[in-house]
């Protein structure tokens, strides 16, 4: 398979498809990743999502949702979603609203999905206490001798240690349900109709696994309600936009609809 085909459209018998290579450096067990995607997309279709409202996998000849070639490269193919666009960044508040609608609908249609059937493809992805423990261990080791240069930032993180177990503690207490979470809820993971600019579907399901809807919402806000790019080095440009927050919250709630 020629490298130029990866992640691009291809036409076979008047139908267009997207061919992608699965990143096995990140996802060591691609069969589990693809099992998650297959189950979630099938459930979305069963619950009423139309042809353009969810990704549709093209099965390999052995009926698996992926193909492994002779060099152990893992490939998958999706139907191409016609008359759609994907924005790297929202170009208007309405675009941001529609992205929120898409992620809200994603939660709504997966509300009763048996989340225990999904694999955790990136272990402890949102286990904040473990992340903090790993952080403090790295600070103590100080392998490159740079900790002294960021002492203020280190203390900032340590001073908030009481907040880090909140989600896990609330799940244990039965107050926070574990749901299907997307875990990469950026605007460039939403397809919009190219004419109406309304939400079609959520894409890039590689990180779909058991989690919390609050982390999906929070990730969208972290990325979308900021006044600067996430890698901006000039912190004077980084602010929280309440207007963008309200826009996203309204769209997300509209997408959620009847979820309580």
Language model: regions and residue ranges:
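Short strand-connecting beta-turns/loops that link adjacent beta-strands
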Residues: 13, 71, 195-197
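Conserved ATP-binding subdomain of kinase catalytic cores across diverse folds
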Residues: 22-133, 213, 255
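Active-site activation/catalytic loop segments of kinase-like enzymes and analogous catalytic loops
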Residues: 214-256
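ATP-dependent phospho-/nucleotidyl transfer catalytic cores
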Residues: 20-21, 27-31, 81-99, 112-182, ...
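Glycine- and acidic
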Residues: 22, 202-203, 231-235
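Catalytic activation segment of kinase domains across protein kinase-like and atypical kinase folds
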Residues: 189-219, 223-226
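Single conserved hydrophobic/aromatic residue that forms the stacking wall/gate
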Residues: 1-7, 12, 260
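Protein kinase-like catalytic core scaffold
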Residues: 17, 53, 76, 179, ...
